[in-house]
Amino acid sequence: MPVTDSIADYITRIRNAGRAKNKTTDIPYSKLRENLSQLLVEKGYIKNFTVITTEKFPFLRIDLKYTAHGDPAIKEISRVSKPGRRVYDGKDIKKYLGGLGLYILSSSKGVITDKEARAQGVGGEILFRIY
């Protein structure tokens, strides 16, 4: 069955794998998902990811990160802009949880965080928030 919202699917797979205490999760490949994964690695929310190509289709294998107590590094991850209701913000994007969390945006500069968007003076579509 085709997925209507690939970003929501990406977020849900990561959230469910973290709650189930899985070490890795597999997600169908797309360039956007690869860019999102790279950003989450840079910000320390996931350990690493690899692109695996099979005969049928490529996918991303994401290595999840946990605290010393075994809790997922991602405490909350949720979609903001949805197919039925797109959410955009200008260059003066507010901080999420007073700067403790991040908004992930799709902008003309690519996939960036709210902090990077404020520094570069760009806005865009708020894809999701993470804490």
Swiss-Prot record:
This is Small ribosomal subunit protein uS8. One of the primary rRNA binding proteins, it binds directly to 16S rRNA central domain where it helps coordinate assembly of the platform of the 30S subunit. Keywords: Ribonucleoprotein, Ribosomal protein, RNA-binding, rRNA-binding. Gene3D superfamilies: 3.30.1370.30, 3.30.1490.10. Pfam families: Ribosomal_S8 (PF00410). One of its GO terms (molecular function) is structural constituent of ribosome. HAMAP family: Ribosomal_uS8_B (MF_01302_B). GO terms for cellular component: ribonucleoprotein complex; ribosome. One of its GO terms (biological process) is translation. Signal peptide: none annotated. InterPro entries: Ribosomal_uS8, Ribosomal_uS8_CS, Ribosomal_uS8_sf. Belongs to the universal ribosomal protein uS8 family. The gene is rpsH. NCBIfam families: PRK00136.1. Part of the 30S ribosomal subunit. Contacts proteins S5 and S12.
